[in-house]
């Protein structure tokens, strides 16, 4: 597949997602990183977003709940170039009914080459990188070229 370049803005669009067992851990991480997160645009699946906003006072655009389609809403935003970073604390030890949606969200994040943090350690590395507050060029699929090849 051909690639093109997309420039991520200095103020990133960050999606925050957590499975039920991981919500307390994500909340703790968000509280610890609240000052840094305030300079970015925050999105979340419904239950996670409402909980984080209530507990931290951060402005978060909440989708609907993940099992009801919120994971897919975030995936659509990623594919449109409207999410720059995904922080997804998922529970690898417990299956969830919407597991296909979870896999699709992680797949779409990989397809569109956005950074993904799946636990506290990767989130710490990601948000302590100087790139988190800078414009960054990334390679993404050239959808126009892809479409031209297929039609």
Curated annotation (Swiss-Prot):
Binding of substrate, residues: 19, 23, 45-48, 65-66, 98
Function: Catalyzes the formation of methylglyoxal from dihydroxyacetone phosphate.
Keyword set includes Ribonucleoprotein: no
Gene Ontology biological process terms, A to Z: methylglyoxal biosynthetic process
Record-annotated active site: 71
Family the entry assigns: Belongs to the methylglyoxal synthase family.
Alphabetized HAMAP family for the sequence: Methylglyoxal_synth
Domain of life: Bacteria
Domain spans labelled MGS-like: 6-151
InterPro entries: Methylgl_synth (IPR004363), Methylglyoxal_synth_AS (IPR018148), MGS-like_dom (IPR011607), MGS-like_dom_sf (IPR036914)
Example of a GO MF term: methylglyoxal synthase activity
Keywords: Lyase
Cellular component per GO, a single term: cytosol
Enzyme Commission number(s): 4.2.3.3
TM region positions: none
Pfam families, alphabetized: MGS
Protein name, per record: Methylglyoxal synthase
PROSITE patterns associated with the record: METHYLGLYOXAL_SYNTH, MGS
Keyword flag rRNA-binding: no
SMART domains listed in its UniProt record: MGS
């Amino acid at each position: 597949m051909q690639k093109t370049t997309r420039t991520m803005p200095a103020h990133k669009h960050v999606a925050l997602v957590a499975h039920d067992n991981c919500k307390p851990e994500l909340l703790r991480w968000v509280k610890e990183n609240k000052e840094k997160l305030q300079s970015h645009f925050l999105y979340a699946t419904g239950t996670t977003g409402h909980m984080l906003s209530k507990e931290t006072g951060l402005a978060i655009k909440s989708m609907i709940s993940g099992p009801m389609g919120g994971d897919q809403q975030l995936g659509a935003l990623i594919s449109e170039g409207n999410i720059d970073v995904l922080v997804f604390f998922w529970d690898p030890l417990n299956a969830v009914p919407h597991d296909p949606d979870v896999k699709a969200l992680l797949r779409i994040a990989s397809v569109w080459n956005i950074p993904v943090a799946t636990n506290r350690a990767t989130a710490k590395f990601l948000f302590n990188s100087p790139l988190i507050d800078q414009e960054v060029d990334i390679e993404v699929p050239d959808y126009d070229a892809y479409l031209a090849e297929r039609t």
